[in-house]
């Protein structure tokens, strides 16, 4: 089936919302226009701020809210509130925007409201770093201690996959991967959101094979595309990165358009409309195959993670489940390599990967090769 996880933006509202109403779209009500508005306590009005109120990173169109205001807390977390309403209508969970800017106790209230609809309802947070060592507001955050987020967006894995696919040394990539695997509680690791692109990053193919923007202006970014004679190599590198994200711990996610090789630097170029006229299809079948493999092999469903080799051009790791084990060998170099997996010599093509799966039961010894 399909589950819908909503994006919950609870650290700020729009200035043009009925709650703030700076532009007067909703009459004379709203916190900005009416000092007696029921929403007035949601915001911090003070002449010291630009525009006379505290706003998200100084953007006056995004006034910040006071999450600890009782009225606001009830609006989001109370009976008939935002979370209760949407989960009651069938949503499967929430992704919290800028989770590191939400107080821990507010996240705990959100969790309680989410889990009131069932323990299977998901609460995932936007955290760009290792969520177990993240510090914000002068203290160590407690996201993954069992009373906050179920999991976070896995930017560390994304950064590792991009680096490896670009051809960077595998040793640092292996260290980054294992740091997350060792630091995260297993339930949080198993449902971490693995991705190559988001609405806040360059698209994966651009990050991997495009010319770095290096602060260049939007006009330059709007015109810059990967040359046609490099597209084949770019798509191959993107598939290498996705092979990592589909076989590492966590849940792989494909940002719309990645499956047809859509390019784009950061906002707004990474948020372009889906290109319905695209004839690019070379990633669709391999990505579908990776998805089928992941569903068919229990090693990828909560199996243990062991790094076998991370050196120069080679990243080799093993996943072990109850019924099956898998060995994944990735090669970001220009030469064919040979490695041992399940006791057998295995070739991996330049810029390619090989996934071997073996049944753990003695009576079913054998393996099949994916790539």
Which residues are covered by each model-predicted region?
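Active-site-proximal helices and loops of the catalytic beta/alpha 8
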Residues: 11-12, 17, 21, 27, ...
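C-terminal beta-sandwich/jelly-roll accessory domains of carbohydrate-active enzymes
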Residues: 331-371
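Carbohydrate-binding surface patches
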Residues: 308-341
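Aromatic/acidic polysaccharide-binding cleft in carbohydrate-active enzymes
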Residues: 137-138, 190-226, 242-280
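Hydrophobic faces of well-ordered beta-strands that scaffold small-molecule active sites
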Residues: 4-6, 94, 123-125, 194, ...
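Substrate-binding/active-site clefts of carbohydrate-active enzymes
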Residues: 1-89, 110-116
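Amphipathic alpha-helical
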Residues: 287-297, 301
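Short glycine/proline-rich turn/loop motifs
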Residues: 53-69, 88-91, 204-207, 214-229, ...
């Amino acid at each position: 089936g399909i589950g819908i996880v909503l994006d919950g933006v609870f650290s700020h509202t729009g200035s043009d919302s009925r709650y703030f109403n700076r532009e007067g779209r909703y009459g004379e009500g709203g916190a900005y226009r009416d000092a007696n508005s029921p929403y007035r306590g949601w915001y911090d009005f003070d002449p010291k701020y630009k525009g006379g109120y505290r706003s998200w990173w100084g953007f006056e169109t995004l006034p910040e809210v006071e999450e600890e205001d009782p009225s606001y807390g009830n609006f989001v977390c109370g009976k008939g509130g935002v979370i209760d309403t949407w989960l009651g209508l069938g949503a499967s969970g929430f992704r919290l925007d800028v989770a590191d800017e939400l107080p821990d106790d507010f996240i705990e209230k959100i969790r309680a409201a989410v889990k009131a609809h069932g323990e299977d309802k998901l609460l995932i947070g936007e955290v760009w770093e290792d969520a177990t060592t993240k510090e914000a507001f002068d203290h160590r955050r407690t996201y993954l201690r069992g009373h906050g987020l179920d999991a976070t967006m896995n930017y560390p894995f994304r950064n590792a996959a991009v680096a490896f696919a670009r051809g960077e040394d595998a040793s640092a990539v292996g260290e980054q991967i294992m740091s997350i695997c060792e630091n995260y509680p297993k339930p949080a690791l198993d449902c971490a959101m693995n991705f190559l692109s988001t609405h806040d990053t360059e698209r994966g193919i651009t990050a991997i094979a495009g010319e770095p923007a290096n602060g260049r202006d939007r006009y330059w970014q709007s015109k810059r595309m990967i040359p046609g004679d490099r597209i084949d190599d770019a798509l191959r590198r993107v598939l290498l990165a996705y092979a990592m994200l589909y076989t590492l711990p966590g849940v792989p996610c494909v940002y719309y358009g990645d499956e047809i090789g859509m390019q784009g630097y950061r906002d707004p170029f990474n948020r372009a409309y889906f290109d319905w006229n695209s004839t690019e299809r070379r990633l669709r079948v391999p990505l579908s195959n990776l998805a089928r493999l992941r569903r068919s092999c229990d090693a990828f469903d909560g199996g243990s993670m062991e790094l076998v080799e991370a050196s120069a051009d080679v990243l080799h790791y093993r996943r072990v489940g109850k019924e099956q084990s898998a060995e994944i060998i990735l090669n970001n170099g220009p030469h064919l390599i040979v490695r041992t997996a399940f006791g057998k010599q295995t070739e991996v093509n330049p810029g390619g990967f090989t996934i071997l799966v073996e049944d753990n039961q003695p009576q079913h010894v054998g393996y099949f090769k994916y790539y």
